[in-house]
Amino acid sequence: SAAYRTTRSSLRSLATEGLELISGRDCAALDIGCSDGTLLSFYPRWVDRFGVDPLDDVDQIGDWAWSAKAPFPSADLDRAFAGKKFDLITAASVLEEVNEPRAFFARAKSLLTEDGVFALETLYSPMILTRTAANVFAGGVASVYSISVLERILRDCELKIFRGSLTEKDGGSICLFITHAESSDYDFDP
């Protein structure tokens, strides 16, 4: 993921925005689909960095971050984390490859601290379809979502979206910041 400037910029933005939401404390961050650790490298040293990815790129991550070559979720990761909680979880360009999104979100929720943030960037179907981005579908993605479908899946998993934005990544993506449904820490009250 470090090979392209636009990808690095997008990952830096996701890491920075997520960290700003929980700033002012020591924290632990998990990057799902971390590839070569590019997103993790944008965190300051005081962040405990963890990355998981089923591909060989994860082997490039040095001792500066804990990493595992494993799919998410998996029994191996459950054993490795053994009750660990994360203040910030990120997943960029991962949801498109997930066959069971409810299991994915449920496991992420179980790893999130009470006031934690889950930053998700994924392809956004209205933008992909209106731009006729056929290369997205030719690439073999498992799914592409609209905001209403994502909201429904997240609601089923007792999570909620509290901030979002559209991005140009991969022809049209959406960046969402998610937390526990019962949390009011990030509610906007004018």
Predicted feature descriptions by range:
Residues L159-D170:
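Conserved S-adenosyl-L-methionine
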Residues S1-D59:
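Extended interfacial segments that mediate partner engagement and assembly in macromolecular machines
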